[in-house]
Amino acid sequence: MKHVFSVCLVIVALGVTAGAQAAAAGACEANGKPAKLNFTFNDLNNRKIALSDFKGKVIILDFWATWCVPCKAEIPGFIDLQKKYAGRGLQIVGLSVDDSLPTAKKYADAMKMNYPVLLAEGKEDILMAYDPIPSIPVSVVIGRDGKICSRHLGIASMDVFEKEIASLF
């Protein structure tokens, strides 16, 4: 009987641990910092777009550049997420950190990017606002409440993004 109790206790402990890990993997921090959305950039049509225009939506800010191979690898996944979740309030925003308008526009057109691409070239203040951005890609997930849910340095799995944004709808 003692052996059966021990086995049951181990099974319960493993179940609780696995459940907590699964919840943590898909949930956002309850005490996320407020996202700084007080920045305005030109888009690929040379129109001024403010990040604050996207308040009330679930936002993925993607810091990237045309020469960045991991950035290029992530873009098709972001295109798919935008298609799948736009109707539920997702807005992916690409921030091209060091490309000129003609270079970024040509690249975005070739990649068939279906979300706003904003030119952040020479805008070090945005890089500092989301903690120092040491390298790219960096993606920041922001909830409808304007709080940062997560920050991904380097390439991240679209499954991870999907779990995070699902917890925000």
List the model feature ranges, each with a label.
Residues 6-16:
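Bacterial N-terminal signal peptides
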Residues 57-59, 63-67, 135:
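Short pre-active-site segment immediately N-terminal to redox-active cysteine/selenocysteine motifs
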